[in-house]
Amino acid sequence: MDDQSRMLQTLAGVNLAGHSVQGGMALPPPPHGHEGADGDGRKQDIGDILHQIMTITDQSLDEAQAKKHALNCHRMKPALFSVLCEIKEKTGLSIRGAQEEDPPDPQLMRLDNMLLAEGVSGPEKGGGSAAAAAAAAASGGSSDNSIEHSDYRAKLTQIRQIYHTELEKYEQACNEFTTHVMNLLREQSRTRPISPKEIERMVGIIHRKFSSIQMQLKQSTCEAVMILRSRFLDARRKRRNFSKQATEILNEYFYSHLSNPYPSEEAKEELAKKCSITVSQVSNWFGNKRIRYKKNIGKFQEEANLYAAKTAVTAAHAVAAAVQNNQTNSPTTPNSGSSGSFNLPNSGDMFMNMQSLNGDSYQGSQVGANVQSQVDTLRHVINQTGGYSDGLGANSLYSPHNLNANGGWQDATTPSSVTSPTEGPGSVHSDTSN
């Protein structure tokens, strides 16, 4: 221990016994008779050593290099190194059982997979652009969707550029700091025992510290991509963007089948082709429409009347055209006094079938004035051409009374035929079906 004390005193530049170092060698200690007087001197020397340690940071680079060179050239330096190795061997037992490698962070792996799937990280192979193209194709591929697709790709490219720029800055800072620490540890390994394995462990610790910054960068990038997808590729937003023509077609089918507004698969496919949408979108639209109609029957009755008026006008024009065609082609025009009959066209048959629904008749007060005038016009045309009585008078086309007590839809009964109340020789016979 005396050798170790003398070695430390020599390296510090001051002898613990109160004597300065001369020529790199410490002077012999004083006789044992002066131990009482040397107590204060030792305290003062320890204070001087601490002062020198505290002033190391104030030294210039040349002074530090000179002291480092003197330490490396000192003859007691190997002995100091061996002592430090023994101390480390005793105190280093507690850290040997520590885990060498930590498992990969699952959250970081999820972020990496998401960025790779969206085309942000890794080589650009489509990623989110392919998703945008699929969404545009599913929604019909209109010009508006093409514009949104191009906007989505532009913003996704911008997010990708920002991500890679910040990732390069992160990697550069991490590499610079890691290189600095490794050089520092290699330099210190000349004075104190530091193994290459310990340097690798320190590098791993540095990378784990920096991984929190990397995780924050990837998390913010994933949030930006999710916001971008919700803005451009959200299915709910696409459902609200049906064209006016598609909405008209769907509403017309709904109100013309109000007794049973559940289209078959063939009808859904036909409506999807007409509206340039998918079959699933048609199913979703009818489901939402049924729910809204049952909740607000009074509100949607006015809309039903409008579509009923449109159907009535179409049927009236079809009947008038058929009658005019018969008058043109036949030598004698049938009237109410003649003995003869003629068949109505399909469109007229369909309209005549609207006389009653589920066996119930509806008053004309349920239909607006415009609808009533169209019904009167149609009845007048039929009476003039076929001797038809007022069996159709003042009947509403659509009615909200198709819901049962449980809020469900009643199945419409299909009338077998629609005939005149008085079957004279000039009556009209028409077999119809739903």
Curated annotation (Swiss-Prot):
InterPro entries linked: HD, Homeobox_CS, Homeodomain-like_sf, KN_HD, PBX_PBC_dom, TALE_homeobox
Gene3D superfamilies: Homeodomain-like
Region of interest (PBC-B), ranges: 130-234
GO cellular component labels: nucleus; transcription regulator complex
GO biological processes: adult locomotory behavior; dorsal spinal cord development; neuron development; positive regulation of transcription by RNA polymerase II; regulation of respiratory gaseous exchange by nervous system process; respiratory gaseous exchange by respiratory system
CDD domains per record: homeodomain
Chain's gene name: Pbx3
Residue ranges of DNA binding: 235-297
Protein name: Pre-B-cell leukemia transcription factor 3
Organism: Mus musculus
Record domain PBC: where: 41-234
Compartmental location: Nucleus
Biased composition (Basic and acidic residues): 32-41
Compositional bias annotation for Polar residues: 405-422
Sorted UniProt keywords: Activator, DNA-binding, Homeobox, Nucleus, Transcription, Transcription regulation
Membrane spanning residue stretches: none
Region feature PBC-A, mapped onto this chain: 48-127
A GO MF label: DNA-binding transcription activator activity, RNA polymerase II-specific
Annotated Low complexity bias: 326-341
Family recorded in the similarity comment: Belongs to the TALE/PBX homeobox family.
Function: Transcriptional activator that binds the sequence 5'-ATCAATCAA-3'.
Assembly: Interacts with PBXIP1.
